[in-house]
Curated annotation (Swiss-Prot):
Region: Golgi retention signal, residue numbers: 731-773
Species assigned in the record: Punta toro phlebovirus
Name listed for the protein in its UniProt record: Envelopment polyprotein
TM region positions: 713-733, 1279-1299
Record carries keyword Nucleotide-binding: no
Leader sequence segment: 1-17
Residue spans, topological domain Lumenal: 18-712, 810-1278
Residues flagged as site, Cleavage: A271, P272, A809, C810
Annotated stretches, region: Important for correct targeting of the glycoproteins to the Golgi complex but not for heterodimerization: 769-773
Family per similarity comment: Belongs to the phlebovirus envelope glycoprotein family.
Site (Important for glycoprotein C and glycoprotein N subcellular location): K1311
Pfam families: Phlebo_G2_C, Phlebovirus_G1, Phlebovirus_G2, Phlebovirus_NSM
Source taxon at top rank: Viruses
Length: 1313
């Protein structure tokens, strides 16, 4: 069964890669094809068999060649080696052996294709399908069909020897490859060794740095010990001095404040602030207040209270400086849970238990906050919108997941009694304080925000949501308030500062195993509460507030660094909040409507089609530039700002009519607008004629009788004026007499000469007549023999030549010849294979270039037409970047000296990328930011115990003012590209856009374009902008690679998303944000260039240096109008393309409709015909001299078809024979064309689109004159009519001169009177 399935699958295989063996003689031809895996024995066997069958192999040697090499005599013994070369080849290769006259021969070819079909088969040469097995056993030399072994043993021996030599050659090649691979392996080993050495050196350097740090740490510890000893000595001296002096002073504490506080915060100096480690302050677990980190009495005993050396998972997690940076910056303040235990804040009565309480209200606010939890805890807490503590816990023995959203049960480890600790962590990085202020001011706004969590600020139609780290405060009776710009200050006041006290374990003379400290409440000190027994001493702040000199102390008390009151700048006032911190919460931000909206249609604009162009009136905005495009041709107009503009007609639209797309740029604060105008077709004479211009005079067919008389009069007046000026100049130069000064004198002289010549001619004629009739005496005179001149008919030949009509259809047409086409009959159809490379000129815009493929029968043809759609000079973009409008925002925090990061001269060396711990909660926003530190005043007057300068830390960031961006780019070059509509031989249509050089692969062949064109210059001082919403603009500033302040591109991003989000990967000019520190707060400003204002002002189209810039047809880049021209050559390549001609007669009837346009011009004339056909076909018409050709595919039914033709004379009268596959019929194209003139004196300051292959044939006076004669009815009628108009013009001129003279005389008479 399996073998049967395999056999069926094998027969269904389609072989692509194959060998083909062709043998022929004078009587027959045989073709056989084999699969790719066919063995050498099989190929040799069938080569020998076919040779014998066709009686071809009779000589001992043959004339053979491999591939394109020269033919050589090759013996039959060595022919197998050549077949082996074909069998081994991986590319297309052939072996051919033929006789001298090619009457007999044999060819073995490999097509060079690839497939995955395995096996040796005989396949169909056309379809590639399996036919049969090859029938030759590999290496056996026999066939399965009973063929005998090859008789020529010498051939077998030679073949084996050749195979041995081939194997030896292959072995040598493998040895060479092996050597190369071994050398590469050695190089890789050397590189690996080098890398290992480098890593070893880096490791040694790191160990060296680590040893240096450890040594430095050791030095710091020694310095700390020395400093502690000095402080102790100074304490003793101070105690003695106090005993001596009963009057206490504040001078000594002030002097000692620096040293004493250095002792208390020295451990902080040893740990860098950015280190993601546990808070290094040794008294972090000596909490201010009761130190009860609990929600109820069931919480972990290690948290009730927090003590030295006792683990509390929840609080220990908060000491991680990367998780709660704000809390660790204010370690001397209380956590929210401690504040609840100390009655500072209240709790929500309802406790949420995950899995029990399914009401969403319990978790509604929690759902918007994102947090991180450690393992082995069962609860979280947070401050809700009411400013109260809300508690969320899991069921018994379930732990909170890492995202603090779910609960899970973990199996206990062996010997473990409790797996999950009953403690919690906060979802917010916050601290709380006592005695907060109340606030009764207005609602705190949050700019650009719709909603934060459950707090709604405004309704937004368009918004975006994301999790952000937002600062917040809580106030009494106000609840939680989110703050956009957090500005805080931390002051130190003796009357409002917290102390932590401790004693040493073992100082009561009981032995202890480990050295440790023990927490003591400050309220246990006798000097604080007289009912207590503990004798306490402390640092200078503690001793300044309490009397430390009563007796020998038991307990040491120090003030908690940064535990002084924390104030927030709220609406310009400093408020002491109840709690302050950060939370990562879901924020809905408003998405503003884009300022740069896509180009809008101007529906209210008014348009009118006038003789000189399209008149457009705006709805109030002032138009500066306009671009009109139709049928691929564009023209522009530029003017001073005005509410109306007249745009010239592009191309022949003034007479042809149709839709015109118009783009208008204006001075209003919006992008350019677009409108579509439809103009009706008009008579060519009315559209393109003028009276006082030379081409108006030349368009004789457009003149009426009155305009002809007026033209004649003006022509005579012009001649008279020129003649008068010339004769007067000659008279002044004494070159002519006075009698010839006036043109009338010259006219009299001409008439006298004419009459004299006529009289002499008459006299001579009369004399000859008298001599013939004998009225005069005869004299015998020998008559000379005159040779009769040959009649050349000069006049007739001239008139014949000038009356010939010139015309080109399809712009350029090439007909395939017999060498390019090979046809065979297949049933009722004809199958033709064409291989050709044709080069022809591209047509002007709207015209077509055609390649006509004719079949073997009359009127069989296929056409490849290439219609030129448009031509553009487009920008080749250079460097680019994205940018937007950015505004700065600042956060600030002032810390006293030796508090937090304000240590030593650290503020002076603060780096822009160094973030203070107060703002570490916002470090994950990934936006452009910088950090500053400004030294401010110190000492008690500025709320500090230390007289050294305090530190004002600033975290500034930039954010995009709008949710959009613009791309700025330069044009390194301007290149030409042309769009074509290509119709294949089977009627398939495809739109192709090509540059030079460019090639398009089509299903019938390839189309290539080569251009001869000049680029444009003068654009280096211009930059271009592209909106993310669509549209382009121009800016009169050169593109600079480096961002500079005060220029476009002060901030540059690599992508649109990076620009909108103000990502930190964007580069920016230095010093963009300006700072003004004011003791407790900062004012930051930035004056950045607004790219959106630039875009609106320079929205395309714009005109610079006589060139108009606008967007391309596909709206992907910028193009320029330059009034230029290009020469375009098309190359069509067909390689064995098959075309089927259906041997069926197709009838059609065609009627000429009209012809309109111009002659001897670039635009050509539109010839339109109406064709009726019962089915789809190819219409073909040509004149007898084949100079005028029409060719296009037609559809069934009756339709109108138009093509652009080029004529060289104004009167068109062409007789064409047309056919759609049947007998040819007659069609006559008849009409008149106008002369448009080479120059156009209308305003063209903006330029027009590039002309493709402008007309090389100049205006011809002979063609014009022949058309004039035909139009006037023939030579004789033309001469009489012209003389008549001249006579009428002279009469009008004489009357005009008489009237002038009468008017002058009457004026002179009035002056005399």
């Amino acid at each position: 069964m399996i073998f049967t399935i395999l056999n069926v699958l094998t027969r269904a295989m389609l072989v692509m890669s194959m060998y083909s063996l062709t043998t022929w003689d004078s009587t027959s031809r045989n073709d056989m094809c084999f699969s790719n895996d066919s063995p050498l024995e099989g190929l040799v066997y069938y080569w020998e068999t076919h040779s014998k069958r066709h009686d071809y192999k009779k000589q001992e040697s043959q004339r053979c060649r491999v591939g394109d090499s020269d033919k050589k005599m090759i013996t039959n013994v060595t022919i197998i080696s050549l077949i082996s070369e074909i069998q081994k080849s991986i590319s297309e290769l052939s072996l051919s052996c033929v006789n001298d006259d090619n009457s007999t021969g044999q060819v073995l070819t490999f097509n060079g294709l690839e497939d995955t079909i395995r096996g040796d088969y005989i396949v169909d040469c056309v379809t590639g399908l399996y036919q049969s097995d090859i029938g030759v056993g590999v290496g056996l030399g026999r066939t399965h069909h009973g063929h005998q072994q090859m008789k020529n043993k010498a051939v077998v021996i030679d073949e084996k020897e050749r195979m041995i030599s081939l194997l030896e050659t292959q072995q040598s090649e493998n040895d060479i490859k092996m050597q190369v691979l071994m050398s590469e392996i050695e190089q890789l080993k050397n590189q690996l060794s080098k890398k290992r050495n480098e890593r070893g050196q880096e490791k040694r350097d790191a160990e060296k740095v680590m040893s240096d740090l450890m040594a430095r740490n050791s030095d710091l510890r020694k310095h700390n010990d020395i400093l502690t000893a000095e402080i102790s000595q100074m304490k003793n001296k101070n105690t003695i001095q106090r005993n001596k002096n009963t009057v206490s002073t504040t001078v000594v504490p002030a002097i000692l404040s620096v040293a004493l506080l250095s002792s208390s915060v020295a451990p902080i100096i040893a740990a860098p602030p950015d280190s993601p480690m546990i808070n290094p302050w040794p008294h972090a677990k000596n909490r201010v207040g009761t130190g009860m980190y609990k929600y109820d009495e069931n919480d972990d005993s290690g948290c009730r209270p927090i003590r030295y050396g006792v683990s509390c998972i929840g609080f220990d997690f908060m000491l991680k400086m990367d998780k709660y940076p704000f809390f660790n910056a204010f370690i001397g303040h209380k956590t929210p849970l401690e504040s609840f235990a100390d009655k500072i804040i209240e709790k929500e009565e309802e406790t949420c238990e995950i899995g029990t309480n399914k009401e969403f209200k319990c978790f509604e606010e929690r759902a918007y906050i994102k947090g991180t939890c450690p393992t082995n805890i069962n609860a979280v807490h947070y401050i809700d919108n009411k400013g109260k503590l809300r508690y969320v816990k899991c069921k018994e023995n379930l732990e909170m997941t890492e995202d603090c959203a779910f609960c899970r049960k973990i199996k206990k480890k062996a010997g473990q009694s409790v797996q999950v600790q009953k403690t919690s962590v906060p979802l917010q990085d916050a601290i709380c304080q006592e005695n907060s202020d109340t606030y009764s001011g207005p609602k705190i706004p949050f700019k650009g925000v719709c909603k934060i969590g459950l707090i709604k600020y405004k309704e937004c139609k368009f918004k975006t949501s994301s999790y952000e780290t937002v600062s917040f405060i809580t106030l009494k009776e106000k609840g939680k308030i989110y703050i956009e710009h957090l500005m805080l200050k931390n002051i130190e006041v003796v009357t409002n500062v917290s102390f932590v006290c401790y004693e040493h374990v073992g100082q009561d003379e009981q032995e202890v195993e480990h050295r440790a400290l023990k927490r003591v409440s400050v309220n246990d000190c006798k000097i604080v509460d007289n009912s207590k027994q503990k004798i306490c001493t402390g640092d200078h702040v503690f001793c300044e507030k309490y009397d430390c000199s009563t007796s020998y102390p038991d307990v040491t008390c120090i003030h908690a660094p940064g535990s002084g009151p924390l104030y927030i700048n709220l609406m310009g006032s400093w408020i002491k909040p109840q709690c302050v911190g950060y939370e990562r919460v879901l924020v809905d931000r408003e998405v503003k409507q884009p300022l740069l909206a896509p180009e809008q249609n101007c529906d209210t604009c008014v348009s009118e089609c006038l003789d000189e162009g399209v008149h457009i009136k705006s709805t109030g905005f002032e138009i500066t530039s306009a671009v009109a495009c139709s049928h691929g041709s564009c023209i522009s107009a530029h003017q001073e700002p005005s509410t109306s503009v007249i745009v010239p007609y592009p191309g022949l639209l003034a007479s042809v009519g149709g839709r015109i797309g118009i783009h208008l740029s204006h001075t209003s604060d919006s992008a350019s607008v677009h409108m579509v105008v439809v103009c009706p077709p008009r008579d060519s004479c009315a559209a393109h004629n003028c009276l006082l211009c030379y081409h108006g005079i030349l368009n004789y067919q457009c003149h009426s009788t009155l305009s002809a008389i007026l033209t004649s009069f003006l022509l005579i007046l012009f001649i008279y004026t020129v003649f008068s000026v010339t004769t007067n100049i000659l008279y002044v130069l004494r070159l002519i007499p006075k009698q010839l000064k006036s043109p009338v004198g010259w006219l009299k002289l001409f008439i006298n000469w004419l009459l004299t010549a006529l009289r002499i001619k008459t006299r001579n004629v009369m004399r000859r007549i008298n001599q013939r009739i004998g009225w005069v005496d005869h004299h015998d005179v020998e008559r000379p023999r005159h040779r009769e001149p040959m009649r050349r008919f000069k006049t007739t030949l001239l008139l014949t030549l000038i009356m010939m009509t010139g015309g080109n259809a399809c712009s350029n047409t090439v007909v395939a010849n017999s060498k390019q086409t090979r046809c065979v009959q297949e049933g009722s159809n004809t199958k033709c294979s064409i291989t050709a490379t044709i080069t022809l000129r591209a047509g002007v815009i709207g015209a077509e270039s055609c390649f006509i493929i004719k079949g073997p029968m009359e009127n069989q043809q296929k056409t490849i037409s290439i219609k030129t759609i448009s031509s553009e000079t487009v920008c080749r973009e250079g460097s680019s970047f994205w940018t937007s409008l950015y505004i700065p925002s600042c956060l600030s925090s002032r810390r006293c000296h030796l508090v937090g990061d304000c240590v030593g001269n650290k503020c002076q060396s603060w780096r822009d990328d160094q973030l203070s711990r107060e703002f570490s909660g916002v470090k994950d926003n990934h936006i452009m930011n910088e950090n500053k530190c400004f030294e401010q005043c110190g000492a008690i007057g500025c709320g500090c115990f230390n007289i050294n300068p305090s530190c004002l830390y600033v975290h500034a960031y930039l954010k995009s003012a709008r949710n959009e961006a613009v791309r700025v780019f330069s044009c390194s070059d301007w290149v030409h590209r042309v769009s074509f509509e290509v119709k294949g031989p089977d009627g398939e249509t495809e739109l192709v856009t090509l540059g030079s050089p460019g090639t398009k692969f089509l299903n019938w062949g390839t189309l290539s374009l080569s251009l001869d064109a000049e680029g444009i210059s003068g654009t280096n001082s211009i930059s271009f902008l592209e909106s993310s919403k669509g549209g382009f603009a121009l800016y009169d500033e050169g593109y600079n690679e480096i961002p500079r302040e005060g220029f476009l591109g002060e901030i540059r991003c690599s992508s649109e998303s990076a620009a909108i989000s103000a990502h930190k990967s964007c580069i920016r000019a230095p010093g963009l944000i300006k700072y003004k520190p004011m003791t407790d707060q900062i004012e930051c400003t930035a004056s950045l260039v607004d790219p959106f204002a630039i875009f609106l002002k320079g929205s395309l189209p714009q005109t610079r240096n006589g060139q108009t810039f606008t967007s391309t047809k596909d709206k992907k880049t910028v193009q320029a109008f330059t009034n230029g021209a290009i020469k375009a050559l098309l190359s069509i390549n067909l390689d064995d393309h098959e075309i089927v001609f259906i041997n069926k007669v197709k009838n059609c009837d065609a009627t000429f409709l009209n012809v309109s346009g111009c002659y001897s011009c670039d635009y050509g004339a539109h010839v339109c015909v109406k064709v009726k056909s019962s089915e789809s076909a190819d219409f073909f018409a040509e004149s007898e001299d084949k100079t005028t050709v029409l060719s296009f595919p037609i559809q069934s039914g009756t339709h109108d078809y138009c093509q652009v033709l080029h004529f060289q004379k104004p009167l068109v009268d062409e007789r064409l024979s047309y056919s759609c596959g049947s007998e040819p019929k007659l069609i006559v194209i008849k009409g008149t064309l106008v002369c448009m003139g080479v120059y156009d004196f209308r305003n063209k300051t903006g330029g027009s689109s590039t002309v493709v292959n402008p007309s090389e044939g100049a205006w011809s006076i002979s063609n014009w004159f022949s058309g004039l004669l035909d139009w006037l009815g023939g030579p004789m009628k033309a001469i009489l009519k012209i003389l008549g108009f001249i006579a009428i013009g002279i009469v009008c001129f004489v009357l005009f001169m008489i009237l002038i003279r009468i008017a002058v005389n009457s004026i002179n008479i009035k002056k005399k009177n």
